[in-house]
Each structure stands twice: as structure tokens, then as C-alpha cells.
């Protein structure tokens, strides 16, 4: 059988622990037998990041700017325990954070929907994609404990020394204050990423803030989205038969719970942090969530939404059998292959991505799955497979 050819490589970012083991299995059993796989390989495993002083992460992000499509394995973001375990030179930053900053991207997370894994919300039939703004607000906030009576103010000092002051509160006793910010350029970039991705996936886009209460801060988000939509995207949305819809965040939550899904929900940083966990949990499993970083310049980085599955990795090292769900990691590869095919006009590659996704879903819907799904499925007859067995079962259906 002749293999599918590729003209341009995908940037491949290898990772850590159990997901690194699955990565190799997926390539060996599901990709390399069918594709003459071209990748620009970067080892983002923690040991190699440490050896290169994290330069490898920066290099992989810059390569994504060159080739426009990347696929990333889950990676460890070190804490104090990991610094000790891996004898690290320092506590390296989150690779995702570094890559996101270089590509100036927005993260879109969507559940993989299969029969037999039923959402908690019974009327959800289609995926709900969460787009989270990844800059500023409370995550770059400055906070202060107020010890007792006094006046707290916001002060803006212009380059010429002119001051603008706004009273926050006249304190009669102890309290707390918080200052947070955002920048128009980041909000504009977020808006364009959301509108572009909606066009890309032919889905309606919802955006929600609390502009009735936050008349300057949240209202600026609302205004920037509307201005960019009207000037750059309205006609394109009309042609695609999709719509942009703005509402208040509390109304959006109520509408989401009553909807059947099938749209992108753009959220400010904190709202996106909370709502993406709510949506993924309500759809059944974090191991069934895709994640793609989209930059307004048209760079795409695909990955699973979950971590490195540390507990299973330690079992694997002891020679014990694991039943680790590889679905989201498989879909990271299919997402990247499909986008590569789309950009290069390679229909064969796009068709293969569709075929692999169908084989994965068919395997689960026929009752063959990993332990985590077996515990929540509504299917009457279930066969629990180990990590490798599940991937081989998918290969049989390809």
C-alpha cells in the first residue's frame, strides 16, 4: 500500500510521562503505516527542556511560525516537587504559556462527542467550544490588604506627568482592593482569533461579558468585538451562514444550559477558566477534550486538553498494565494533519484525518474503550482495553 505523501512538515512537540508513551504508540500504529510523515521534531520532555535552558520550547514555537501547524504532546509544568524529582536547574515556566505568548494565540477547547458517553446536560447534542482570552484581568492583577481607615484611588500618570484619579473607596475599617488591566491590542487579537476560528469551523460565535455593571472595562471588550466584526467579518459571516451573538454572561450561561450545543463561546480570561472546566466535566471526561491554539496570523497548535497522566506513568515504570485514554491525543494529531492538508491542498491527508477520527469513535461506540470511559458509559456491553490494546483496536478499524 502506498503511503500518503506530505509536502510540508508539521512541527512535532514531544512531551512527558504517560502521554509520551502513548505518543509513540499512536505514531507507530496509527500514523506511520499510512503516512510518509514529515515532522520538524522538538523534544519538550522536561529533561531536554532543562538541558537546553528551555530554549527548545522557544525554538518549537518559532518553528510553528514558519510551518504554521504544530502538534503537541502533554508536558510537565514543574512545581517544587518536580524540580527535586528531575534535578532541574530552575523551575521552568509552563511550555504552553511560553508558546502562547510567542504565537499570541487564543485557546479553543471542545469535547469529543460519542454515543454512550452522555453529557450531564441531556439536551447537549453537539460540542460546545470554549474560547478563553489568555491575557490579563485577575491573572495579572495587583492586590492590597487595607489595614484600616483611609482612601483608595486608581491613579493614571500620563507621560507628561498629568495625573487622572478615580476614587475606589473611602475605607472606614480594614478591607481589600484589587487593580487589574487589559490592553486593546490583546483584546483585538483575541477577537480576530475567535472570528477566524468561527469561519474556519463554520460555527456561530457567542461572546459574553458583564458590560451593564462594568461600563468601561467589560464594555471595552464588547465594543472592540463589535467594531472588528462590523469592519472585517460581518460579510464573511453572512456568506458562511453563521452569526455573531453578544449577550451578558449570566444570560449566556442560561442559554448554554438550554441549548443543544454546536457553537463557539468566547469568554474573558476568568470566565473561560471556569466555564471550560464546567463544559469538559459536564460532557463526560477531560480525556475527551481537544485543544487548539489559534493565532490571528494563522498559526495552529493542536494538543490534548489534559495533562501527562503521571499516576499511570508510575504504574507503567513498575511494569504494571495501564488503561490510559489516548483519544484526545489522537485528535490532536488528526487536527494538525487535517489543517496541514487544508493549507497544502492535500485532500488525501484531510481524508485520512477524518478516517482516523471515525475509527476512534467507532471503536468506543462498539463498546471497546479504556477504563475511564467504561466507568461512565451507558452502553450495555463493554470491553475494557489496556492502553496499547485500545490503540490497536482503532488500527483494526482504519
Model-derived features with residue positions:
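N-terminal glycine-rich phosphate/adenylate-binding segment common to multiple enzyme folds
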Residues: 47-159, 163, 270-274
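Flexible, glycine/charged-enriched surface loops at secondary-structure junctions
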Residues: 35-41, 201-209, 233-246, 341-353, ...
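Glycine-rich phosphate/nucleotide-binding loop
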Residues: 256-355, 359-366
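N-terminal alpha-helical transmembrane segments of multi-pass membrane transport
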Residues: 2-8, 18, 22-23, 28-52, ...
Amino acid at each position: 500500500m502506498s503511503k500518503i505523501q506530505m509536502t510540508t512538515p508539521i512541527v512535532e512537540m514531544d512531551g512527558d510521562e504517560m502521554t509520551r508513551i502513548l505518543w509513540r504508540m499512536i505514531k507507530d500504529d496509527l500514523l506511520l503505516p499510512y503516512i510518509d510523515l514529515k515532522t520538524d521534531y522538538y523534544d519538550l520532555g522536561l529533561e531536554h527542556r532543562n538541558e537546553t535552558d528551555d530554549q527548545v520550547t522557544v525554538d518549537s514555537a518559532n518553528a510553528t511560525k514558519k510551518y504554521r501547524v504544530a502538534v503537541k504532546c502533554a508536558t510537565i509544568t514543574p512545581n517544587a516537587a518536580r524540580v527535586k524529582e528531575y534535578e532541574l536547574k530552575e523551575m521552568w515556566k509552563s511550555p504552553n504559556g511560553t508558546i502562547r505568548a510567542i504565537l499570541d494565540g487564543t485557546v479553543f477547547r471542545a469535547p469529543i462527542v460519542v454515543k454512550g458517553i452522555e453529557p450531564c446536560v441531556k439536551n447537549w447534542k453537539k460540542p460546545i467550544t470554549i474560547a478563553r482570552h489568555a491575557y490579563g484581568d485577575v491573572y495579572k492583577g495587583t492586590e492590597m490588604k487595607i489595614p484600616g481607615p483611609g482612601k483608595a484611588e486608581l491613579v493614571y500618570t500620563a507621560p507628561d506627568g498629568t495625573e487622572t484619579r478615580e476614587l475606589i473607596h473611602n475605607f472606614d475599617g480594614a478591607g481589600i482592593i484589587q487593580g487589574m488591566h487589559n490592553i486593546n491590542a490583546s483584546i483585538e487579537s483575541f477577537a480576530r482569533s475567535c472570528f477566524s476560528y468561527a469561519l474556519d469551523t463554520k460555527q456561530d460565535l457567542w461572546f459574553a461579558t458583564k458590560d451593564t455593571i462594568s461600563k468601561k472595562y467589560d464594555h471595552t471588550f464588547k465594543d472592540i468585538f463589535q467594531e472588528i466584526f462590523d469592519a472585517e467579518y460581518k460579510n464573511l459571516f453572512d456568506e458562511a451562514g453563521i452569526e455573531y451573538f453578544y449577550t451578558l454572561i449570566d444570560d449566556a450561561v442560561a442559554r448554554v444550559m438550554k441549548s443543544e450545543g454546536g457553537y463557539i463561546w468566547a469568554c474573558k480570561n476568568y470566565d473561560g477558566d471556569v466555564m471550560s472546566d464546567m463544559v469538559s466535566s459536564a460532557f463526560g471526561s477531560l480525556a475527551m477534550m481537544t485543544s487548539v491554539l489559534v493565532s490571528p496570523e494563522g498559526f495552529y497548535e493542536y494538543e490534548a486538553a489534559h495533562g501527562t497522566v503521571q499516576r499511570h506513568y508510575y504504574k507503567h515504570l513498575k511494569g504494571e498494565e495501564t488503561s490510559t485514554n489516548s483519544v484526545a491525543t489522537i485528535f490532536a494529531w488528526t487536527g494538525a494533519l487535517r489543517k496541514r492538508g487544508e493549507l497544502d491542498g492535500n485532500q488525501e491527508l484531510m481524508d485520512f484525518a477524518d478516517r482516523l477520527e471515525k475509527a476512534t469513535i467507532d471503536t468506543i461506540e462498539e463498546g471497546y474503550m479504556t477504563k475511564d470511559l467504561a466507568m461512565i458509559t451507558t452502553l450495555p456491553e463493554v470491553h475494557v482495553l489496556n492502553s496499547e490494546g485500545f490503540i490497536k483496536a482503532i488500527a483494526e478499524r482504519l
